[in-house]
Amino acid sequence: MAGERPPLRGPGPGETPVEGPGGAGGGPGRGRPSSYRALRSAVSSLARVDDFDCAEKIGAGFFSEVYKVRHRQSGQVMVLKMNKLPSNRSNTLREVQLMNRLRHPNILRFMGVCVHQGQLHALTEYMNGGTLEQLLSSPEPLSWPVRLHLALDIAQGLRYLHAKGVFHRDLTSKNCLVRREDGGFTAVVGDFGLAEKIPVYREGARKEPLAVVGSPYWMAPEVLRGELYDEKADVFAFGIVLCELIARVPADPDYLPRTEDFGLDVPAFRTLVGNDCPLPFLLLAIHCCSMEPSARAPFTEITQHLEQILEQLPEPTPLAKMPLAKAPLTYNQGSVPRGGPSATLPRSDPRLSRSRSDLFLPPSPESPPSWGDNLTRVNPFSLREDLRGGKIKLLDTPCKPATPLPLVPPSPLTSTQLPLVASPESLVQPETPVRRCRSLPSSPELPRRMETALPGPGPSPVGPSTEERMDCEGSSPEPEPPGPAPQLPLAVATDNFISTCSSASQPWSARPGPSLNNNPPAVVVNSPQGWAREPWNRAQHSLPRAAALERTEPSPPPSAPREQEEGLPCPGCCLSPFSFGFLSMCPRPTPAVARYRNLNCEAGSLLCHRGHHAKPPTPSLQLPGARS
């Protein structure tokens, strides 16, 4: 059909990706830069906001509002994470790029991208159980096997993430989501906006600390002190989550006892734990909260210990046959055992199948628990003005260029012996062939054919068993071997998503309903007080970098040499506010002249135009437009 755009697809078997006329490659025969492939894949997975209805606000965060939506064509229920701040655009793109490359049952599944009024919004799977924080604060009974399974799910997700060479940096009970299915619970890890490549500190080389980011209650002591830190910071955050699971208390120091050096107050914490708690489970939580990072075990060993604890746990007894204690342990009763982490607790009664924290509701925020007459409650986060009591979120620079995170395995870790039960043999993971590539590792992947753009039964998403380990070193001299590009799992009629055009600009309104705001209202972008003189304090330069990101410079003369990795403008009218220069590693400004085929939203060039309809259908319920 004349005037119709050919379908977007990746290179087929035996094909070598080359640039078309006027492309960034400078002519036919040159390989396409990875930024172009990432951009084209992002355009192919775009959705319009008015493709969804039944919008219900289910939560809000520091940068976004979360809506439960239903796709009109497929009827699939998803979660739309609408970005509220234009300055957070690059962090959102980093999160989308990373989630699009992760495939694991305990990692939140990425469904697609939605663009509305110049803002990028992520579409993820819907978790009907809410957050782990909401589950623990509810009166829902949770037996010890259920809690151990939740902890194992989170540990397996983080083990997979660390194996890809990336660590989370913002692991909290707010960012762990729960799915209810078949009378049980499954936990997944989400919110990868602060994820970073695992650093490698070599002897003799200059060691520059990473930025101080995260939620203070879950941040490791070395992070709060501005020291060097790595993936072991996630282990400390996991230990705080385990303490929340064991005692069913919030991470607030008014409920979860902490020391003045941001550690866990072990004697005071044990007063919150009933005698029925499995001792290895408690010791694992204490071990993960070690002050010394080298003393914390990696997640490969943590998952092994959790699996062994589950195997050794006695069979649960029906609730009707459970003997109730005469005087159940409450938050203000019990003595404080001394002797450090190695002090033993009374042996648990094998007849008990549920935690004693299920016998009464969690404490209300108005009545913090008491830890004994001889203990003083300490909130170390209130002693520093920059932390503001811990009810904030520390950020690096929300507007810095989005550097894709390479998904490569980190260097071998030194095994750390856990002072717990005897460990089984190490989990043997099958080795997968290493494929070397020159593209940005976290760039979205292209669908091979046009079938993902049309409604109908689509292929199932690629599972973890079919993926490859990526060895994406920028200095690799080997070209990428030709082969079929893996398909991007988009939601069609099953778990995929359809390809549509860009978003319209009409405003949206949400269905009235209860709003669950689980995050504090304050956001801090700078580093802790007193670090302004340090040369590595990158967080204090956020405002100049934000202005630099929005600035557009004229394009270079045609005769100037061009590099292969250069920033490309978005070809779609929906992405005109974007520069998309941060998709590339090239620091040169974005050219002002569009060099690709125009992807405007005229009816003649749409991938899926509406036929003879005079007007596009209007949504019954609308989402509020993002502020640009």
From Swiss-Prot:
Gly residues bias: start-end ranges: 20-30
Protein kinase domain: residues covered: 52-310
Coiled coil (UniProt feature): none
Required for interaction with SPRED1 and SPRY2. Required for TESK1-mediated dephosphorylation of SPRY2 and SPRY2 inhibition of ERK phosphorylation: annotated segments: 529-628
Active-site residue numbers: 170
A GO term for molecular function: protein serine kinase activity
Positions of the UniProt region annotated as Required for interaction with YWHAB: 421-526
Residues with Phosphoserine modification: 215, 439
Family per similarity comment: Belongs to the protein kinase superfamily. TKL Ser/Thr protein kinase family.
Role, per record: Dual specificity protein kinase activity catalyzing autophosphorylation and phosphorylation of exogenous substrates on both serine/threonine and tyrosine residues. Regulates the cellular cytoskeleton by enhancing actin stress fiber formation via phosphorylation of cofilin and by preventing microtubule breakdown via inhibition of TAOK1/MARKK kinase activity. Inhibits podocyte motility via regulation of actin cytoskeletal dynamics and phosphorylation of CFL1. Positively regulates integrin-mediated cell spreading, via phosphorylation of cofilin.
Protein name, as recorded: Dual specificity testis-specific protein kinase 1
Organism: Rattus norvegicus (Rat)
